[in-house]
């Protein structure tokens, strides 16, 4: 067994992975924001304290999870009125800043949105560009339906699941 005094090099830090989810119900009278984009002509938006962007929120939760930095509610929850009505992109940029301030580099974030609408594929490139700019690292977005099963399949709301990879060190 080596030791630092014997000249053995210190191993590089291991990557850390986090998982995040977010779920919001549709609510009449709200604009639909999803994956950092406003979706015109999609009918109702999502209920929430902020813009209720499930993709951005799940990405925030994944980043916080990977860095051991709490969760979305802790940083931006309903008890924090300064975040009321905030855009998901703003929250995501702030989440990335918090993670970096804790000494982590962000490798990437992958998010899958689950629901019947909007159809992510037609605006995937645009969404990935907006979210990647907010994070300062690659963000990929995919969509899935539930073949009519559960609340997303019945058109009652949206759900998103995300993973994030971070590594300690500048």
UniProtKB/Swiss-Prot annotation:
Keyword 4Fe-4S: no
SUPFAM superfamilies referenced in this protein's UniProt entry, alphabetically: IpsF-like
Binding annotation for 4-CDP-2-C-methyl-D-erythritol 2-phosphate: 22-24, 49-50, 71-73, 151, 154
Positions of a divalent metal cation binding: 22, 24, 57
CDD domains with a match to the protein in the record: MECDP_synthase
Key words, A-Z: Isoprene biosynthesis, Lyase, Metal-binding
One Gene Ontology MF term: 2-C-methyl-D-erythritol 2,4-cyclodiphosphate synthase activity
UniProt EC number: 4.6.1.12
GO biological process: isopentenyl diphosphate biosynthetic process, methylerythritol 4-phosphate pathway; terpenoid biosynthetic process
Matching Gene3D superfamilies: 2-C-methyl-D-erythritol 2,4-cyclodiphosphate synthase (3.30.1330.50)
Named cofactor requirement(s): a divalent metal cation
Chain positions of site Transition state stabilizer: 49, 145
Function statement: Involved in the biosynthesis of isopentenyl diphosphate (IPP) and dimethylallyl diphosphate (DMAPP), two major building blocks of isoprenoid compounds. Catalyzes the conversion of 4-diphosphocytidyl-2-C-methyl-D-erythritol 2-phosphate (CDP-ME2P) to 2-C-methyl-D-erythritol 2,4-cyclodiphosphate (ME-CPP) with a corresponding release of cytidine 5-monophosphate (CMP).
Quaternary structure and partners: Homotrimer.
Family of the protein in this entry: Belongs to the IspF family.
Record PANTHER family: 2-C-METHYL-D-ERYTHRITOL 2,4-CYCLODIPHOSPHATE SYNTHASE, CHLOROPLASTIC
Protein name: 2-C-methyl-D-erythritol 2,4-cyclodiphosphate synthase
Originating species: Streptomyces coelicolor (strain ATCC BAA-471 / A3(2) / M145)
Gene it is expressed from: ispF
């Amino acid at each position: 067994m080596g030791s630092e005094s014997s000249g053995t090099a210190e191993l590089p830090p291991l990557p850390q992975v986090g998982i995040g989810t977010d779920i919001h119900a549709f609510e009449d009278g709200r604009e639909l924001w999803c994956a950092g984009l406003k979706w015109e002509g999609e009918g109702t938006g999502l209920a929430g304290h902020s813009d209720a962007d499930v993709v951005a929120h799940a990405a925030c939760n994944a980043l916080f999870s990977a860095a051991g930095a709490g969760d979305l509610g802790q940083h931006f929850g309903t008890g924090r009125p300064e975040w009321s009505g905030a855009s998901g992109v703003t929250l995501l940029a702030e989440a990335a800043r918090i993670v970096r301030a804790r000494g982590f580099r962000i490798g990437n974030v992958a998010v899958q949105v689950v629901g019947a609408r909007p159809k992510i594929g037609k605006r995937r490139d645009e969404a990935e560009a907006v979210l990647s700019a907010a994070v300062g690292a690659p963000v990929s977005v995919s969509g899935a339906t539930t073949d009519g099963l559960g609340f997303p399949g019945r058109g009652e709301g949206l759900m998103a699941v995300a993973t994030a990879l971070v590594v300690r060190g500048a």
